[in-house]
Structure formats: C-alpha cells, structure tokens
C-alpha cells in the first residue's frame, strides 16, 4: 500500500506540520466479518466510472449553478464525500472568507430553513421516542401535537409564541435529551445540538441569523453548484455536488480537469446511519467512497486532500458512544503521534486515539505509491480554523501544479 503524505493545520498557533507516514500494515485496514457485513456495496456504475477514464463524457444536461468563469487558468476544486459530511458548509465558509458574505435578504431566507431544521429534528426525536416506548415529561406531552402539526414560515414573519413555547420546553425535556444522546440509528441533524443552545435568540421576533447560525444550517445539496473566488490572483472554481446516493450519478460531469479534490468525511459519523439508508453506516460509506476515488485514474494529476471533519462533534460523542461498538478492530493506544496531539492540545487520549485510528483507516486505502494525499482534521463551522486550513490547501494545490509542470 502506498504511503500518505499528511498536512495538518495546528489549531493552537496556525503552524502547518507536514508528516510522511510509512506504509501501514494490512491490519490497520482490516475489519471483522460482522463489520464487513455492514459495508454497503458501491454502485456498479460508479465503480466502472472510477476505474476508467473515458475520452468523452456524454452530457446529461446537468445545470451548474453559480458564477462560472471560462478562463483556461482557473483552478478547479471539486468537493466530494458522502451526504452530511460538511461540503456545503465549506462552500459557505468560502463565501464568508473570500467574498462579501451573506446579504440581509439571504440571511432572512436562512431564517426559514433554520426553523425547518429545528422542527424536523424534534419530529424525528418524537418518532424515536414512540418507537422506544419513551414518553415526554407529563407537563410536556401537550406540546407534541404542536410540533407534529404542519408548519409554514416566511422570511419576514416572527415565529408564533405557541411554537416557541413548545420548542423551548421540548429542547429542555430530560427524556427527549436521553433519546437524543443514544440515538445513533437516527439520521438526526448534527446542528440540533447547536440550535438547542440558542432557542431564545432564534425565536426572538427580530431574529436575523448570524454567520454561525447559517454555517450550522443543513440544506440537502441537489445537483451541482459552483462558486468562484479570487485568491492570490487566481480564480478558484469550487464545485459542490450532492453526496447522497441518489445524487452521485451527477458526479462524473465534474470529473474532468480537476486541479484539486477535497474529500470530506464526518468523523462524528462513525456511529450514525445514512440519511438515505438507516441500515448503512456513514463512516463505512465514506471509507468505501474514498477507496474508489483516491485510487481512480480520473484524479491522477489532481491534488488529493482529505478533510476529517466535524472534530468538535467527535470530541463530544466519543466518550458516550464507544468506537469499538461500531468498529470492533479499534483499540485505544497509549499515545498518539505529535501531529495528532497538536491538532487537539486539550483533548484527552481517547479523542486523540480515535482521531489517529480513523486517519490510519483512510491512509491505508491509498494504494498508489506515487500519490500523496494530504489530510486535515477540521471543524467546518470554525471560521478561523478553516481560514488557516485553506491557506495550507492553497499551498498544496500550487505545489502540486508546480510538480506537474516539472515532470
């Protein structure tokens, strides 16, 4: 197996650390029989596409949204990954960092979507409580019907006091929170943890979403969207494509002439089911996709960059949801390499050990010895961290381009 060159942004001081790891042993990527039984089968069409590199790709009329530039020297960056890995959040961060950001009109539109995220999560939790024969606290039962009722919201209209009262009460309900903390088989939106802590502010009649509110907002990506940014006198064209299985047939229309591929993985997905398939595991799906993509000839000249994302959520859940329950070959190590410790200087060994374990899982899948893949631990909602990481990503892309010209 080929080695994987990893580049990390130090979250404490911004220093970039580069480390070259030797070939990993086969045991790093092995799984038990019971674990393999849960691995989803990659769609045949995607396997065929990734194994070959046809001369002509037939167009299916996929519409690319955004401001496209036609310059031959543009840097094309493709964001790939399974659903709910954080690709669209990266795009929103790029808008905040390298463009004017979000207008008041757009912020008011996000207000409606944030409301829908909260209500959808509560409906899912109420359904899970019913399936588990768990009741709300007696004083909160009256709010069940309020949440399950069909709701509509407009960008300029305040939320009703009735809905606020119900949401406020249920987000504090201890029995609902217990189901929430144990609901690894739920396709619960990660952002619900964040919005729970801001209910009073969100339901204020004058509420306008903040940058963080927008970054946490979950919107399913359908089709292909494009944003162009001017960075250091270079035009970067970022393509975000839907990660759920139903969207992957559209990926091929972005595969040609890719300068850099950013593959996103939700670290917090090690114990979560897929949004589109309750029997599938998010991390297993990501490993399967990465295996096919990083070894594909489509990207033989592209910089390969891996974002192990949602580190903040991973740190929160690793103590309440054991990794070994979902990945039986996992063993906590006594110490981790310096580059892992640098990423999480305040984290305990359980968190660092988990980070290193999943890093090695992805590292071991790169079977092309000549290909360097660069890895970053990220929290896509952390703007300052993403800014440092993106500086490193730009360096990686430019270095890869220079090597291509030389060889």
From Swiss-Prot:
Alphabetized UniProt keyword annotations: GTP-binding, Hydrolase, Lipoprotein, Magnesium, Metal-binding, Myristate, Nucleotide-binding, Palmitate, Pheromone response, Sporulation, Transducer
KW Phosphoprotein (keyword) present: no
Region G1 motif, residue ranges: 76-89
Gene Ontology biological process: G protein-coupled receptor signaling pathway; negative regulation of MAPK cascade; negative regulation of pheromone response MAPK cascade; positive regulation of conjugation with cellular fusion; response to pheromone; sporulation resulting in formation of a cellular spore
Cofactor(s) the protein requires to work: Mg(2+)
Segments forming a coiled coil: none
One GO CC annotation: cytoplasm
Lipid linkage positions (N-myristoyl glycine): 2
Lipidated residue numbers (S-palmitoyl cysteine): 3
Region annotation G3 motif: where it falls in the sequence: 236-245
Region (G5 motif): 378-383
Stretch list, region G4 motif: 305-312
Residue numbers spanned by region G2 motif: 213-221
Known partners and oligomeric status: G proteins are composed of 3 units; alpha, beta and gamma. The alpha chain contains the guanine nucleotide binding site.
Function recorded in the entry: Implicated in the mating and sporulation pathway. Probably coupled to mating-factor receptors. May act in concert with Ras1.
Sequence similarity: Belongs to the G-alpha family. G(q) subfamily.
Protein name: Guanine nucleotide-binding protein alpha-1 subunit
Species name: Schizosaccharomyces pombe (strain 972 / ATCC 24843)
Organismal lineage: Eukaryota, Fungi, Dikarya, Ascomycota, Taphrinomycotina
């Amino acid at each position: 197996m080929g080695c994987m060159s990893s580049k990390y942004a130090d979250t404490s001081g911004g220093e970039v650390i580069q480390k070259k790891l030797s070939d990993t042993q086969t045991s790093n990527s092995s799984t038990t029989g019971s674990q393999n039984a849960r691995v989803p089968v990659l769609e045949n069409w995607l396997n065929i596409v990734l194994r070959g590199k046809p001369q002509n790709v037939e167009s299916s009329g996929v519409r690319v949204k955004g401001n496209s530039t036609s310059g031959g020297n543009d840097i094309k960056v493709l964001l790939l990954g399974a659903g709910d890995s954080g690709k669209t959040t990266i795009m929103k961060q790029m808008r905040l960092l390298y463009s004017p950001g979000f207008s008041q009109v757009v912020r008011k539109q996000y207000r409606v979507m944030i409301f829908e995220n909260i209500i959808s999560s509560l409906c899912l939790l109420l359904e899970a409580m019913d399936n588990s024969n768990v009741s709300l606290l007696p004083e909160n039962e009256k709010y069940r019907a309020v949440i399950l009722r069909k709701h509509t919201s407009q960008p300029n209209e305040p939320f009703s006091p009735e809905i606020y009262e119900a949401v406020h009460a249920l987000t504090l309900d201890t029995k609902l929170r217990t189901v929430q903390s144990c609901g690894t088989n739920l396709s619960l939106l990660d952002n619900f943890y964040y919005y729970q802590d801001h209910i009073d502010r969100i339901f204020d009649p004058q509420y306008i979403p903040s940058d963080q509110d927008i970054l946490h907002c979950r919107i399913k990506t359908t089709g292909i969207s494009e944003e162009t940014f001017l960075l250091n006198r270079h035009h970067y064209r970022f393509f975000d494509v839907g990660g759920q299985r139903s969207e992957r047939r559209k990926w091929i229309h972005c595969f040609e002439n890719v300068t850099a591929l950013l593959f996103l993985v939700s670290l917090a997905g090690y114990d979560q089911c897929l949004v589109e398939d309750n029997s599938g595991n998010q991390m297993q799906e990501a490993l399967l996709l990465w295996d096919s993509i990083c070894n594909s000839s489509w990207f033989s000249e592209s910089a390969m960059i891996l974002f192990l994302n949602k580190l903040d959520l991973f740190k929160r859940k690793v103590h309440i949801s054991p990794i070994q329950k979902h990945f039986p070959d996992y063993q906590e190590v006594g110490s981790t390499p310096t580059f892992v410790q640098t990423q999480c200087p305040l984290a305990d060994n359980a968190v660092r050990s988990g980070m290193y374990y999943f890093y090695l899982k992805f590292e071991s899948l790169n079977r092309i010895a000549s290909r360097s893949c660069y890895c970053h631990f990220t929290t896509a909602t952390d703007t300052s961290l993403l800014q440092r990481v993106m500086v490193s990503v730009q360096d990686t892309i430019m270095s890869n381009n220079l090597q291509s010209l030389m060889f």
